[in-house]
C-alpha cells in the first residue's frame, strides 16, 4: 500500500502552488529538465502509449521563433521565462507500442482507426502535460501553462516534416511571487462532483 505524502508535499504540489506570470532571473539547467522528464514519464497513459513529445525552449533564438505564435497576453511572460516547454503529441505514437506495450498488438488498435489514434494522442499528451507540471513543482520549480497561441504557427515553426503537433505551452522557472494575482476560487466538491 502506498503511503500518503506529507502535508508539506501536498502544499507544494497543489494547495499552495500557483500559476506564475513573472520570473526571477534564475536559470533552469539542462540537468533539471532531464530530472523533470525522468519523473513525468512514469505517469500513466492509455496502453502506456506515451504520446507526448516535449521541446524545451531555452535560448533567445528559440523564443524568437515562438514569438509570432503567442497571444498578446502571453508574450511577455513567455519571453522572460527561463524555459518554455512545447508539449506536443506524436500522431504516429503507435509505432512505439511494440516496445512500450508488448502484451498484445496494440499498434493495430490505432492504425485501423485514425480518429481513435488522434483522440488518444491528444488526450494522453494532455495528461502528460499535467504530470510535467507536478514534476516541476516537486523539484521546486514554478510553471505557467498556456493554450493562448497559434498552434499552426508553432507546428510550422518547430515541427515541419515531422509527425508532431503542438498541444500546449508551459513556462517553467522560479516564479516572482510579487507578480502573482490574487488567488482565484475553485469549484466546491458539490459543484464539481457527484456520488452514485
Curated annotation (Swiss-Prot):
Catalytic EC class: oxidoreductase
Reactions catalysed, as given in the entry: 3-hydroxypropanoate + NADP(+) = 3-oxopropanoate + NADPH + H(+)
Induction statement: Up-regulated by the nitrogen regulatory protein C (NtrC also called GlnG) and repressed by RutR.
Molecular function GO labels: 3-hydroxypropionate dehydrogenase (NADP+) activity
InterPro entries, per the entry: Nitroreductase (IPR029479), Nitroreductase-like (IPR000415), Nitroreductase_HadB/RutE (IPR050461), RutE-like (IPR023936)
Documented EC number(s): 1.1.1.298
Pfam families per the UniProt record, alphabetical: Nitroreductase
Transmembrane segments: none
Gene3D superfamilies (alphabetical): NADH Oxidase (3.40.109.10)
One GO process term, biological-process aspect: nitrogen utilization
Keyword set, alphabetical order: Flavoprotein, FMN, NAD, NADP, Oxidoreductase
Cofactor: FMN
Role of this protein: May reduce toxic product malonic semialdehyde to 3-hydroxypropionic acid, which is excreted.
Alphabetical list of NCBIfam families matching this protein: PRK05365.1 (NF003768)
Entry similarity comment: Belongs to the nitroreductase family. HadB/RutE subfamily.
Protein name as annotated: Probable malonic semialdehyde reductase RutE
Organism of provenance: Escherichia coli O17:K52:H18 (strain UMN026 / ExPEC)
